[in-house]
Structures are given as C-alpha cells and as structure tokens.
Design a protein with these regions (language model features):
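Conserved class I S-adenosyl-L-methionine
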Residues: 1-43, 57-61, 78-81, 178-183
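C-terminal alpha-helical "lid/dimerization" subdomain adjacent to the S-adenosyl-L-methionine
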Residues: 6, 146-200, 210
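Class I SAM-dependent methyltransferase SAM/SAH-binding core
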Residues: 47-99
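A short acidic, Gly/Pro-enriched loop at the edge of an enzyme's catalytic core
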Residues: 98-110
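A short SAM/SAH-binding and catalytic strip from SAM-dependent methyltransferases
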Residues: 108-122
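A short glycine-rich, Lys/Arg-flanked "PGG" loop and its adjoining helix->strand segment in the class I
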Residues: 123-135
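Conserved beta-strand signature within the Rossmann-like core of class I S-adenosyl-L-methionine
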Residues: 136-144
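Core SAM-dependent methyltransferase catalytic element
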Residues: 205-227
Length: 227
C-alpha cells in the first residue's frame, strides 16, 4: 500500500457507520444527488464493477436501477459495512484499484467515486480500470470539484472554515477529514486540471468522453465509452 492510500485509509476507516449520514450532511445534502447522476450516465442493464465502493452507496443505487453489481475497495472496514448493507447480495472484493484481480473485459460498465486523488499514478489507474470493461461499455466517475466565479469564495469558506469546524464538533474521525478535504481537492485540481484528466481518459481507450459539473462545480462527473 502506498503512502497516499495509507493516508486515505487512516482518514476514512474510523468513520464507520457515520460515514453515509454525516457525509451527506457535510455536502449539504448534495452527495446522494451526485451519486444518482453518476449512475444515470450508464446505459441500462448489465454487470457493473463499482470501484472504491466504500460502504456501498453507489452500488446500492446501481442495484436500484436494475444492474448486477460487484464492489471493490481497499478498506476492510468499509467493506464490512457494505457487507452488512447488502447481506451477501453483492459480491465484494478487497483489492487495489491499480491492480484489479479480474480478467480483461469482464464487466459491462464500471463506476468509481472519489478515487483518483488517492492513487500515485491516476493515468495508469484509469488504464487498469478500463482494462476490465468490455468494448462498448461505459466508465463513469464522480469527484469533488473546485467551483469558479462567484461560487469560488463561498466554496473556499465552506471547505476552509465550515468543514474543519464541523469535523471538530462531530469528532469520531471527522475532525481529520474536515482539516484534510479542502486542501486535498484544491491540490488535485491544481496538479491535474481538467484537460490533463481528459487526456488520461483518452489514453485509457475511452471515447466520447463527457463532463458535467454539478452544484456550481462542487462535483464533477466524467464518463466515456470503452472503444
């Protein structure tokens, strides 16, 4: 496990059962809507691999929309919560996104959420994710964004002031998340602006790549089709 993955696991594993409820609250109720939009980018039907599945929120939405789902995550703590959520109804695999123990072209589609900020080589990871998708299938991602224009100062105030303060009030690991998240998002987009990220997608063999910014740019959904 690399240092970045270590940091991510140390941050999020202690959140446990509070992750879903408090995470939605800290996004001002937007996170569930973002996840629904992510899933809506896929064509209907088929078997979806949900990478960085966490507690299974995206996987649950995929099932609700009629997909078969397999979840992958590096954290045993998060997978334990997902297992309780699904009661064995969704296969769950503990694995790293950059080394999936899966055959090429073994899934119809693939989703991933809040992943590329935590890997050493995002471009190589995206190649590995696309490897397991059948030609014609979709890959879709959800990541936090950095709003521009009039929304930018409000976002900076929220992630720089409100989130850390809320984390201190909530405790149980949320203090560290509140302190970390804003800087992590800002640094990712500074190092990897959208044009660079789109180059990763094209380099992974994905075509027709599209981008939608949600909630004034607070979230970014990217999706494309495996050539």
């Amino acid at each position: 496990m690399n240092r970045i993955e270590d940091q991510a696991r140390e941050l999020f594993s202690p959140l446990g059962p509070t992750y879903d409820r408090v995470g939605a609250a800290l996004s001002l109720g937007q996170d569930p809507r973002w996840r629904r939009y992510l899933v809506s980018r896929l064509s209907r039907g088929g078997h979806v691999l949900d990478v960085a599945t966490g507690t299974g929120l995206v996987a649950a939405e995929l099932r609700r929309r009629g997909f078969d789902v397999t979840g992958v995550d590096k954290s045993p703590e998060m997978l334990a919560i997902a297992e309780r959520r699904f009661g064995g109804g969704v296969p769950l695999i503990r694995a790293s996104a950059d080394a999936l123990p899966l055959d090429p072209a073994s899934f119809d589609h693939l989703t991933f959420t809040y992943l590329l900020r935590y890997v050493v080589d995002p471009a190589a990871t995206l190649v590995e994710l696309a490897r397991v998708v059948r030609p014609g299938g979709f890959v879709a991602s959800l990541e936090f964004g950095v709003p521009s224009g009039a929304a930018g100062p409000l976002w900076s105030l929220y992630v720089g002031g409100v989130l850390p303060l809320a984390g201190r009030v909530l405790r149980n690991g949320w203090r560290e998340v509140g302190d970390f998240l804003g800087g992590s998002i800002r640094d990712f987009w500074r190092r990897h602006p959208l044009d660079r990220q789109l180059a990763w997608w094209h380099g992974a063999g994905l075509s027709g790549v599209e981008v939608t910014r949600l909630s004034l740019g607070g979230a970014v959904v990217i999706w494309g089709r495996k050539a």
